[in-house]
Amino acid sequence: CGRKGCFEAYASATGLIRMAKEAMAQHPESLLHATAAEGGEVNGRTIFQAKEQGDPTAAAVVDRYIHYLAVGIANIINCFYPEVVALSGGIANQGEALLAPLREAVAPQVYGNQYLQTHTRILGCTLGYHAGIIGAAMLPTAL
């Protein structure tokens, strides 16, 4: 929806791209401009590529994105104690470049119980963009 305070506004691909575009406007020297110019559009992959190439602007954008995502995931863990939090979509395809710092950022925000900090696994879906659709299709067979 794009409203302020909504998890999706900050911790989605749309949120990451919005943050990157805001940073690009303030930092014309950023590699984000070059990666966007090659394909014509900035996206999750190009933002992570610029970070991997050592661009401090892209690194700041990714770190901010991971912070927002970690806050939301920690709140989910604190409320529901899931065994697994599975991330899907294009940004989840970044693998451990996303997941390792995300796990590190989530851990201190999970309530003090050491069990909860290690019990919930944060994983990327192997089904890519179709994970939600496949899960929804399988739901009736599980009921």
Spans of features found by a protein language model:
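ATP-binding/phosphotransfer module of carbohydrate and carboxylate kinases, centering on a glycine-rich
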Residues: 3-143
